[in-house]
């Protein structure tokens, strides 16, 4: 959220959106790569990859098919991890803007992110509840987009631009 407070122009919005997606992709790689590599080794061993003999030609075709199926599974799993990472970031932002709304309305409710009270109060003082509602709507819309197979970068770019300037929603 602190990066969101520093957004100055459209370019900085697009850079932040790309950084969010890049971070999600890097996290997905660190989670998925070891598992993917282990699965590939297992499949190759099961089909006798690297072996010699007449019977291995048929196995080679089966191996190629199994590796293609495995690559498709890996791609789906990696995408799911990326989307889950981005969704968690969006949910965290929803909590932040919920707290902003609590402060703006003077509600007698505890803040979810009390450790961020100074930033929350600064954002609350710099805007109106109507703008905060537009931001929350943008966050909900982004969650929907992420679950609807929209390109993650496009969804995050739209979100960050709207968080910077809710009138663009």
What label would you give each PLM region?
Residues 132-136:
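C-terminal target-recognition/interaction regions appended to catalytic cores
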Residues 2-127, 140-147, 152-154, 158-164, ...:
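AAA+ P-loop NTPase domains with strong preference for DNA replication initiators
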């Amino acid at each position: 959220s602190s990066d969101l407070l520093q957004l100055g122009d459209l370019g900085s919005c697009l850079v932040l959106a790309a950084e969010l997606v890049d971070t999600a992709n890097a996290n997905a790689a660190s989670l998925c790569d070891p598992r993917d590599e282990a699965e590939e080794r297992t499949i190759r061993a099961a089909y006798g990859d690297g072996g010699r003999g007449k019977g291995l030609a048929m196995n080679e075709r089966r191996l190629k098919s199994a590796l293609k199926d495995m690559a498709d599974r890996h791609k789906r799993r990696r995408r799911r991890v990326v989307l889950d990472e981005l969704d968690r970031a969006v949910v965290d932002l929803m909590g932040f803007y919920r707290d902003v709304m609590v402060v703006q309305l003077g509600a007698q409710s505890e803040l979810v992110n009390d450790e961020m009270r100074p930033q929350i109060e600064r954002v609350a003082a710099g805007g109106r509840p109507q703008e905060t509602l537009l931001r929350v709507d943008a966050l909900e819309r982004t969650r929907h987009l992420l679950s609807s197979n929209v390109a993650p970068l496009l969804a995050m770019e739209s979100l960050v631009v709207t968080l910077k300037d809710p009138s663009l929603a």
